[in-house]
Amino acid sequence: MPTIQQLVRKGRETLVEKGKSPALDACPQRRGVCVRVYTTTPKKPNSAMRKVARVRLTNGKEVNSYIPGEGHNLQEHSIVLVRGGRVKDLPGVRYHIVRGTLDTAGVNGRTQRRSKYGAKRPKPGQAAAAAKGKKK
């Protein structure tokens, strides 16, 4: 434990908090190019094939980004918008790709939480028909 005199001379060093999405450089989103699009398996209790893309951002950094929603159209040189937000059961995936922007298409047939997945609002007659088709 330091003496009062030592604290007067040196003071306490403040701890610097590490950010949750450092590759974005304090920006809300960043544009990037897909370097590799692949699937990976989650951590122990869960089981799935999660869709992930390795993205080179405009600031030169490369990050692993999760592709949300069912189905996607991303390939190797697709241009995408990346936002922060980790995937709890995928180690090393700390970013999400924004659906419905740049080269990323929105999720087809999505009726709820559409804004999160870049889906357009269905026309009044089509919503009922799509719901009936899903039930069968």
Curated annotation (Swiss-Prot):
Bias (Low complexity): 124-136
3-methylthioaspartic acid: modified positions: D89
Region (Disordered): 104-136
Gene3D superfamilies: Nucleic acid-binding proteins
SUPFAM superfamilies named among the record's database cross-references: Nucleic acid-binding proteins (SSF50249)
Record GO cellular component, one term: small ribosomal subunit
One Pfam family cited in the UniProt record for this chain: Ribosom_S12_S23
Record's keyword annotation contains tRNA-binding: yes
Bias-annotated ranges (Basic residues): 111-123
Sorted UniProt keywords: Methylation, Ribonucleoprotein, Ribosomal protein, RNA-binding, rRNA-binding, tRNA-binding
InterPro entries tied to this protein: NA-bd_OB-fold (IPR012340), Ribosomal_uS12 (IPR006032), Ribosomal_uS12_bac (IPR005679)
Family, per entry: Belongs to the universal ribosomal protein uS12 family.
Function as written in the Swiss-Prot or TrEMBL entry: With S4 and S5 plays an important role in translational accuracy.
Assembly notes: Part of the 30S ribosomal subunit. Contacts proteins S8 and S17. May interact with IF1 in the 30S initiation complex.
Protein name: Small ribosomal subunit protein uS12
Organism: Parabacteroides distasonis (strain ATCC 8503 / DSM 20701 / CIP 104284 / JCM 5825 / NCTC 11152)
